[in-house]
């Protein structure tokens, strides 16, 4: 089977998160000479395949087989791959069965490697992601099988194939501020404490503010207000409470404690509560590390392009590898149609991605 045939086969599985729809068992059979470990929990399947070629380092390719629901607006069946004008249309074409097909085919054809090659695949990245890669890595750590390096084949390229890799990701801090006032009649504002009026005074000082200056790899951490709600949708009652929700995509310079101090600076003296949670921690892989250097060279060899090192975008499963000290990068096809109707990627990109991964294995 060639990489494009494998790609089409994977696209035909209707693997809407967290259902792998049989795709993981298919991959296990396709790589039958690799040892297989299953880490399944709460309806989520995780497959770890590994093969020890030598006594050297452990390189893991990682990704997810689950996809988001297709939604409306498709011009073809989202789970029947359509080949047209050099593109393949299907849900998951970019995010991220192209990446999975490329590294599965690359490791299948590997004859020589100085250490251990492995694959970690999950059926829950697009959903809650609690029992996916995160859980599988917990089990691998317990078994002393954590890799030294990881390549997550998420779609990273922007304008053309090979133009960007991710060497890190911002974290995500979520917050809810509740300002407590005193409900009253709109005609007697002096007898009430209107939380909207109180909060309105500080909003210009908080909304969209940079919490740090960023650096050469990360944009500044920005305080982004996502929702404000208060009152009963009437015109003659001032509310007794106001709730404001926000998000900070933080770099390595800003912590949850920094966000707490920032909020307190403006809400000090008000009657308020603050709830904070961190759904993802920021990480950065050293640009001089082996995995970054090897992927850079492989991309340059196969495309003639030197990729930029990016940390932009949302979160991914790469963050879970980083938490275990795994030197992790992300590289895949372009990402201009992810989660959209008529998602597509070009056959040429998939073939080039497969060749890049083959070169990584050869030269690592």
Curated annotation (Swiss-Prot):
Its EC number(s): 3.5.1.18
Catalytic activity, reaction form: N-succinyl-(2S,6S)-2,6-diaminopimelate + H2O = (2S,6S)-2,6-diaminopimelate + succinate
Cofactor stoichiometry and binding remark: Binds 2 Zn(2+) or Co(2+) ions per subunit.
Highest taxon of source: Bacteria
Root EC class: hydrolase
Binding residues for Zn(2+) 1: 64, 95, 154
CDD domains per record: M20_DapE_proteobac (cd03891)
Gene3D superfamilies: 3.30.70.360, Zn peptidases
Pathway stated in the Swiss-Prot or TrEMBL entry: Amino-acid biosynthesis; L-lysine biosynthesis via DAP pathway; LL-2,6-diaminopimelate from (S)-tetrahydrodipicolinate (succinylase route): step 3/3
Needed cofactors: Zn(2+); Co(2+)
Keywords associated with the record: Amino-acid biosynthesis, Cobalt, Diaminopimelate biosynthesis, Hydrolase, Lysine biosynthesis, Metal-binding, Zinc
Active site: 66, 125
GO BP annotations, alphabetical order: diaminopimelate biosynthetic process; L-arginine biosynthetic process; lysine biosynthetic process via diaminopimelate
Molecular-function GO terms, alphabetical: acetylornithine deacetylase activity; metal ion binding; succinyl-diaminopimelate desuccinylase activity
Residues engaged in binding Zn(2+) 2: 95, 126, 339
Signal peptide: none
PROSITE patterns: ARGE_DAPE_CPG2_2 (PS00759)
NCBIfam families, per database record: dapE_proteo (TIGR01246), PRK13009.1 (NF009557)
Family per similarity comment: Belongs to the peptidase M20A family. DapE subfamily.
Complex and partners: Homodimer.
Annotated HAMAP family: DapE
Role description: Catalyzes the hydrolysis of N-succinyl-L,L-diaminopimelic acid (SDAP), forming succinate and LL-2,6-diaminopimelate (DAP), an intermediate involved in the bacterial biosynthesis of lysine and meso-diaminopimelic acid, an essential component of bacterial cell walls.
This protein's name: Succinyl-diaminopimelate desuccinylase
Organism: Nitratiruptor sp. (strain SB155-2)
Gene from which the chain derives: dapE
């Amino acid at each position: 089977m060639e990489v494009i045939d494998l790609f089409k086969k994977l696209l035909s599985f209707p693997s809407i998160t967290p259902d792998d729809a049989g795709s993981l068992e298919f991959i296990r059979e396709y790589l039958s000479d690799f040892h297989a470990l299953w880490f399944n929990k709460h309806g989520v399947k995780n497959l770890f395949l590994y093969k020890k070629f030598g006594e050297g380092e452990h390189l893991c390719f990682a990704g997810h087989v689950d996809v988001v629901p297709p939604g409306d607006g498709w011009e073809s069946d989202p789970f029947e791959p359509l080949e047209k004008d050099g593109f393949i249309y299907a849900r998951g074409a970019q995010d991220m069965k192209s990446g999975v097909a490329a590294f599965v085919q690359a490791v299948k054809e590997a004859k020589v490697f100085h250490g251990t090659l492995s694959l970690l695949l999950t059926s829950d990245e697009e959903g809650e992601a609690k029992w996916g890669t995160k859980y599988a890595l917990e089990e691998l750590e317990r078994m002393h099988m954590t890799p030294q390096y990881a390549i997550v084949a998420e779609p990273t390229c922007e304008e053309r194939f090979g133009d960007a890799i991710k060497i890190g990701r911002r974290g995500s801090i979520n917050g809810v501020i509740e300002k407590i006032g005193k409900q009253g009649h709109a005609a007697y504002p002096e007898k009430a404490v209107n939380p909207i009026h109180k909060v309105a005074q500080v909003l210009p000082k908080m909304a969209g503010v940079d919490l740090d200056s960023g650096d050469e790899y990360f944009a500044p951490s920005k305080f982004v207000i996502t929702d404000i709600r208060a009152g009963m949708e009437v015109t003659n009652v001032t509310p007794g409470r106001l709730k404001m929700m926000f998000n900070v995509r933080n770099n390595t310079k800003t912590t949850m404690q920094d966000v707490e101090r920032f909020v307190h600076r403006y809400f000090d003296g008000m009657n308020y509560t603050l709830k904070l949670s961190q759904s993802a921690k920021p990480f950065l892989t050293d640009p001089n590390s082996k995995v970054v250097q090897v992927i850079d060279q492989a991309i340059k060899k196969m495309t003639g392009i030197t990729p930029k090192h990016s940390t932009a975008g949302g979160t991914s499963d790469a963050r879970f590898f980083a938490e275990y000290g795994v030197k992790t990068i992300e590289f895949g096809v372009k990402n201009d149609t992810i989660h959209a109707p008529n998602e597509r990627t070009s056959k040429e990109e998939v073939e080039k991605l497969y060749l890049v991964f083959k070169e990584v294995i050869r030269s690592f």
